[in-house]
Regions:
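Short, charged beta-turn/beta-strand-edge "cap" motif at the junction between a beta-strand
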Residues: 53-59
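A short secondary-structure junction signal
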Residues: 16-18, 78-79, 113-115, 147-150
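Mixed-charge, low-complexity intrinsically disordered regions
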Residues: 1-10, 71-74, 116-118, 123-156
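Aromatic- and Lys/Arg-enriched surface recognition patch
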Residues: 64-134
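Compositionally biased, charged N-terminal/linker segments
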Residues: 1-46, 143, 151-156
Length: 156
């Protein structure tokens, strides 16, 4: 099992959207960065855990967690000319972009703002602090435990 940080803008898809999706399961799509796409396609697996990070807001923060319930598959938006994620170079037989399905696990009692992440020695090596724009990032088990503790989670 691996752990990932998934960045999302809550105006498009926030932790509450994931919670309120049918069965708590949502397609996590719209990735249009090759490095993030490669991780999603090649490394993210069913059963992996995810931290949900709200970006594009006044105070970016880790707000909750989810679990991958379907491994990478072709992002259908790339084939839809009406979608903002349409890619005319993509073909169903050779897709360029991928998505996964995630299931809501929890909203943390307290969000963990980026400013606090930067001040926390145990999180100094996080990919988030080196490659901030990357929307799919690996997280170590030690980082996962530290983050959950800082967010007020007392178990798991």
């Amino acid at each position: 099992m691996s752990i990932w940080l998934l960045k999302t803008e809550p105006a498009e898809c926030g932790i509450e959207d994931i919670r309120n999706a049918e069965g708590g399961v949502m397609r996590w799509d719209g990735i249009r960065n090759f490095q993030a796409r490669n991780m999603l396609r090649d490394r993210v697996a069913v059963g992996d855990l995810c931290l949900i990070y709200h970006s594009g807001v006044r105070e970016p923060a880790i707000v909750g967690s989810a679990e991958v319930v379907r491994a990478a598959y072709a992002d259908p938006a790339q084939f839809d000319p009406a979608s903002e994620y349409y890619d005319e170079r993509s073909r169903p037989e050779d897709p360029r972009w991928f998505c996964v399905d995630i299931r809501f696990r929890e909203r943390f009692p307290h969000p963990l703002p980026l400013a606090e992440i930067k001040r926390t020695a145990a999180l100094a090596a996080m990919v988030l602090l080196r490659q901030g724009r990357l929307s799919v990032q690996p997280v170590s088990e030690a980082e996962w435990r530290s983050i959950r503790g800082l967010c007020g989670v007392r178990r798991g």
